[in-house]
Amino acid sequence: MTFSSEEEQIKRFEEDMVAQDYIAVLRALISKKSIFAQQVGLQEVATYLKEIFIKAGAEVELDESYTAPFVIAKFKSQNPTAKTIIFYNHYDTVPADSDQIWTDDPFTLSIRDGGMYGRGVDDDKGHIIARLTAIQKYLQTHDDLPVTVIFIMEGAEESASVDLEKYLEKHKSLLHGADLLVWEQGIKNSLGQLEISGGNKGIVTFDIKVKSAEVDIHSSFGGVIDSASWYLINALTSLRNKDGRIKVEGLYEQVITPNQRELALVERYAQRSPEEVEAIYGLKLPLLQAEKKDFLNRIFFEPSFNIEGITSGYQGQGVKTILPAEASAKVEVRLVPGLEPHRVLELIRKQLDKNGFDKVELIYTLGEMSYRSDMSAPSILKVIELAKKFYKKGVSVLPTTAGTGPMHTVFEALEVPMVAFGLGNANSRDHGGDENVRIADYYTHIELVEELIVSYE
């Protein structure tokens, strides 16, 4: 089998008129901010997606029942016995905050040095347009699709898909019974293998707040008065061992352990190593788990307790000798199958009370269940075999990823085999500055999706 080099793929991309037409669409899409957390641009971008999919020949419904409009675009096969595949994507992005380093304007698609840069180019607007390009490339040489293709695009994925369950329930009759659902995105890993995964972790996020007094107090009382800062730090410390495991009674007993195939897939394919993580992030502290087998088990199959940020006391220039009266932290627990967000928060509340920290206030912010698959469904196995034709280094098949998304919500609603693969890379920098994809990977994804369509002929 002959595989194209990166240079050859870029040349093919540049000579492909359909791909070039849709790069103009991607450029316009990235220029339109759509940030759920700030309630910016959701209606405009959903409407723009409706317009481009109608122009591409799809039947489109724009459902505005909830905060972020839900876009459904259907390319219906004329074959009455045709199967259906669904692409799940989202059009919202995280902000491009001022503390992020961008070489160019994040909302202007930049093409340089074999890559494309811009907010959402990987997560997730680039995937929408690449997959739409694949449909159009097939229809350029065929009168009809051999399979019905449905795109579902939400606008709140970066905020725990707050209304997705309601949208799916509303449109269940249209979406139920599909042969396959292709998830929003994926990467080519550092070894050049396409990662094909079947799940993701869940999450529960919450704020922890402490108020120790009506006002800040002079620090001369530090020997006899407990400050909000110390109370919060001690409360947080009581919930985690030094090795990173969570100290909450009854939590691990609810975890569903992976089956033998899931364990075998991670052992065979997971390329993330302690050494790679240390190098990529320039770690200054020792890893909580450095032995590779346990390291991977932690990443894929165990929950984790994480502090996103802590706020308390004086942070200005110089010194202010006080005992802070208030302290707060933003906290998350990454979940695995068996753990339900609200139940986890209840266990944490109970543990804090038992540990003597009953003055801590917990405020739930969002939650999402986890989902995991052993990747044995026939339609998923077909994707794995098709992908091997396009990636010289082969594929990496994983039952889950360490990230979070609404896979559980979608599976519970639609009961369809789900698989994630995409056009990102190990350094795509999603949510960070200079978010990017490689042009060759972008075009290879287009070709693979087109080949998936061909496989239904």
Predicted segments — roles?
Residues D124-G199:
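Acidic/histidine-rich catalytic neighborhood of metal-dependent amide-processing enzymes
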Residues T2-D99, E326:
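N-terminal helical capping/dimerization or prosegment-like subdomains
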Residues K166, G222-D243:
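A short core secondary-structure module
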